[in-house]
């Protein structure tokens, strides 16, 4: 059971879990907006950190790779 849960977590299916994702999304959206505003004020709008969407995409790619191999 523990191994199955670990694989479930590693393969990125946490993103399909319905609880708390909207709040997570909203929080990340606000944080990204805040970061972009502060970067624009400093005059460097190059994105240095991964956004929630990037991490989500990585997790999905990892999940698909786990299923295939």
Curated annotation (Swiss-Prot):
Residues 23-46 are annotated as: Disordered. Residues 26-44 have a biased composition (Basic and acidic residues). This is Putative uncharacterized protein PRO0255.
């Amino acid at each position: 059971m523990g191994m199955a849960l670990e694989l479930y977590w590693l393969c990125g299916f946490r993103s399909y879990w319905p609880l708390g994702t909207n709040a997570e999304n909203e929080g990340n959206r606000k944080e990204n907006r805040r970061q972009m505003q502060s970067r624009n004020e400093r005059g460097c709008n190059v994105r240095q950190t991964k956004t929630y969407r990037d991490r989500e995409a990585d997790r999905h790619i990892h999940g698909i790779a786990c299923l295939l191999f």
